[in-house]
Each structure stands twice: as C-alpha cells, then as structure tokens.
Amino acid sequence: MQAACVYSWHNKQRLDRRKIDMTSLCLLHGWATNSQIFNPLRPHLPADWTIHAPDLAGHGRSTAPLSLDIATLAHDIASSLQPNTHLFGWSLGGVVAQYIAAHYPHKVTSLTLCATFAKFAASEDYPIGIQHNLLHRMLHLFEDDYPKHLQQFLELQLLHTPERNELIAELLPDMLRDGTPQGMASALQAIEAADMRPLLSQIACPTLLIFGDKDALTPPRMGEFLAQHLPHAQLVCIKQAAHAPFISHAAEVAQWLQRHIVAVERLI
C-alpha cells in the first residue's frame, strides 16, 4: 500500500511539474506572529526560488473572521497556492500545512514541518500534548496584558538565539500593530481544537520534520509522533534550538530545507 501511494504521488507530480520550471516555496508562520518572522531565514535560501509568505487569517495584515478553525485557515491559504508548491509550516502554520497536504495534495510537492504538532492539547489517548489548563492560562494572560505577554512569548520562542534582543526589537512593533487579543484568542482556540492525527496517513508527499531539542512549547516528542505516523517523513533535531530554529539556527535549517527540496525535485 505504501509503495502504491508513493508511485501515485510521484507520477502526479511528474505530470504537473512539466507546467513549471522554478522552485516555489510557501512559508506559513505560527500563532501570534506574522510573515515577517521569516525575515532571518530568507537570506539563507536560494535566490532563484520563488518565496511566498502570507499572513494567516487573524494575524498580521490579514483580517480575522468571527471564528477560526484549521480548515478555514487552510482553505484561505490553499486557494492562493500554485500547484507544485513546497510548504514550510512552523507551529500553527505546520498544522495548517498538514491540512493542506491532506486535502489539497495537487498543490503540495513537499512538506517541511518545523516545531509543530498533530495535536497540541493533551487527551487520554494523546498524553504527550499540553494540558488544557496551561492553554487557558495563556489565553487569559494575553487578554490581561497583550503587549507584555506577547513580548514574553516572543522571548520564549527565541531562546538560544544570539541576536534575540535585536530580533524582538525588529519583530514586536509589527506584531503589536497588526495583531489583536481577539484574533489571538480565536487562533488559540483553533489550536486547542486541532487534531490532525486522522489525516497523517493521507499525506503522501515527502516530509521533513525540524524540531529544536530545547523546545518547551513543541518538544521533540511531538516530532517523534509525527515521524511515526506520517508515511514518508524524516525527523531532524537541531541542537541548542528552542521553538524557532529557523531563526536561531537559520543557516542550518535552510541547509536541511534546501537539501530536502532538491532531493524531492530530482524525483519528479
């Protein structure tokens, strides 16, 4: 069954690939951030790649609907994707990327999931997740003092980043200007409800998993779960990286990403 899945994906991508010549990469950011979070990564990527980094609904300059769920976020992104796109999803963006890869496979050539999860909230059948009371506490903190706790959240994500203070000074003003507590609350509720586990076996494209070994938000055990349940996945753990390895270890992550994409494109 696995071989048939690979064969089907391979032939479909080969036919579609004839329509394009340039590598197309879409970067999907995480909760409470925006597309500017990828600025430190961009200089390390090949200059001849076409790179698209949209703001998820309710983040950055993208307006927030009355309610958010992963399907809505994914449909919004998928509708703007060209076929044969390489998807890079970080944290919440990684969950959206999983949904797109499962439901819009003709749009996705490869998947790279960075510091993300199949399910964030713990449950009886998923003990590796984060307890609900911690999620609710996070939500209340943001409602209480949005600027203060957004800065603290960003500091946590950028642990072990040498230029952390400079990056926070660059990123935080845009995040405060464009984000709202209401939008973040809706997105956090979408994260709490998200469960991609039933979709993992449907994701046929090659997948690279990148996690930081010091990540407390999405610890490596969440990457190990994905590696065990995705049909064609490789797990890479970046040493001394926390929740944003594409910032703290941008050159190393870019190297892994480029190696992954080049290998996939050689197959098609």
Put a short name on every predicted segment.
Residues A241-A254:
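Catalytic histidine-centered segment of alpha/beta-hydrolase-like enzymes
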Residues E143-A194, P198-L199:
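Conserved alpha/beta-hydrolase catalytic His-Asp/Glu region
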Residues K214-T218:
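Acidic catalytic loop of the alpha/beta-hydrolase fold
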Residues I203, L209-F211:
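Short beta-strand/loop motif that positions the catalytic acidic residue
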Residues A102, S110-F142:
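Flexible "cap/lid" loop of the alpha/beta hydrolase fold
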Residues N39-P43, H52-F88, Q255:
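Active-site loop/oxyanion-hole signature of alpha/beta-hydrolase fold enzymes
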